[in-house]
Amino acid sequence: MRKSGRRLLALALLWPVLLVPSQAPARELLAVGAPFERVFEYQESGEYGGLGAELLRLMAARTGNTVRFRMVPWARAQAMLVQGQADILIGPYKTPERIASMGFSDKPFYQDQMVFYTRQDASFGWDGDYAVLKNRRVVLLNGWAYGAEWERVRPGLQVSVANNVENGLKMLVHNHVDVFVSNRRNTDPVIARLGYGRQVKPLPKVIEVQNGYFAFPRSPTFDKLRLQFDQELNNLIETGELKKLGKRYDVSVP
């Protein structure tokens, strides 16, 4: 009876443990990205900030993980994810090519307006007809996605590539190009920092609205992590927490 009682006691103590779902072991995740204004930034304190960084810290903590960050040029950040050298990419827009090589979060966490920037004294205007760009020099950013319609008309244009927003703006100001294509979130703060407010202007008509996501390596081994982060992001959306964070960082959220 004593042995039987001990067995029953041991089973009673073990029973709650058996009912708890197994948790994936904690991991230190590497999140990579390029400097994206108010989404992913390197701060003077030496910490990484922005809406994307804060969301990843929250979601990592709530899934029992930790996260560290690395900032590299955008084309390199994408390559690191695709090659399995990083666990999360911060902020990509969806394109058919990226969907084929990356696993995107179920929902976006921010939204951008893509526009044309010109010099203040330029007579160029845009009403949606891409034909007006045919004889104008255009600069794009390396590795950025501008939408399906833009990709359709791009082959017939005079296109240069810049590695960052600052270089693109300088090319415009110094008359190396006529039009700079970018988004307002990334570009307007740089215009202010460089003192270009009286030299360049965004055209009022929006080219396209793009949604920004988190992306993971397209591998079955990352499916569970992606689904966990999807659940946490959905919770942040449903509770209104994402909306509050968007206001704090001055980032548009869907």
Residue ranges of predicted features:
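Periplasmic-binding protein-like
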Residues: 34-36, 111-115, 192-230, 252-254
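Short helices/loops that flank or line small-molecule/ion binding pockets
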Residues: 75-87, 103-104, 166-185, 193-194
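A ligand-binding cleft/hinge motif common to bilobed small-molecule-binding domains
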Residues: 79, 91-100, 178-199, 204-208
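Extended ligand-binding regions for polar small-molecule ligands
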Residues: 50-62, 122-124, 135-136, 144, ...
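Bacterial N-terminal signal peptides
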Residues: 10-20
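Ligand-binding clefts/hinges and TM-proximal coupling segments of bilobed small-molecule sensing domains
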Residues: 66, 144-160, 198, 233-254
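Short loop->beta-strand "edge-of-pocket" segments that line small-molecule binding or catalytic clefts
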Residues: 28-42, 126-144
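Extracytoplasmic small-molecule ligand-binding "clamshell" domains
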Residues: 26-101, 161-162, 248
